[in-house]
């Protein structure tokens, strides 16, 4: 199993069954992992497609997968970190319904797993600002996506 990256928070979320439609909790401002609200957005990814690598210098990500299944991979290249040079991966879905909080300064990429729609919600700590993030091509950080 991958080692949990320093600063990552994994929070189990409530799902409430209701005969007219289920309720999926996301985040409260009193939750661990809430570092302010900048914006919330949804993003979809097709099966076996991969988006990333991206590193934020100001934005904390809070990722939830209410539809489909997505594998998230985090890589820590922070020299001062106890988890320097480690990877952490997790698949989130309705069956593994959790919020993944990703701190600033680590690399993140994700892959669509389900045949149907794979959708994530990011509850971001700041509004989108393209100058606070760095990107790399997938082959610049070596990770075995085929497991």
Model-based region annotation:
Residues 1-96, 113-147:
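Non-catalytic, conserved peripheral segments adjacent to functional cores
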Residues 100, 108-113:
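Short beta-strand His + acidic residue motifs that chelate non-heme Fe in jelly-roll/DSBH
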